[in-house]
Each structure stands twice: as structure tokens, then as C-alpha cells.
Amino acid sequence: MDKRKKTAAELEEIVKQRIGAGDFRVTIHRNPEAGWHATIYGRQPAEVHRCQVMADTIAAELCQHYELDE
């Protein structure tokens, strides 16, 4: 199955929407093993941790369908 290409900004928006409301920022980075991964940044450590756990799960699912486009 061919993966659809998405820009980092598009993937960031998808991950942020799937996580939901909160005061955090999502960035997408290349990952040699999975293709790409999401990193969460924010001011509240508990929220960052909660969102990062969710982002890891979401990215694992989305990596099966989307490829990071430069």
C-alpha cells in the first residue's frame, strides 16, 4: 500500500486535532525507524507527558498511512 505524503505542518495539525484541546505545541521530526514522530512541547509537565503518550500512539497509527514530505 502506498502511503500518502503529508507535510510536517499537515501532520502536526492532524496530531493536535486528535489529541484535542490544550496548551501545547506539536512538532514533527524524521525518524529512521518509523518514518516520522511527533514531539509535544508545553509549559505544564503533566500535560506535556499526557499529550506525548497520546501523540506516540497517534503517530504510530498515522505512520502506517502517511509519509513525511519535505
Label the predicted regions.
Residues 1-27:
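N-terminal acidic leader/helix
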Residues 25, 30-70:
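Detector for the mature cores of small, proteolytically processed
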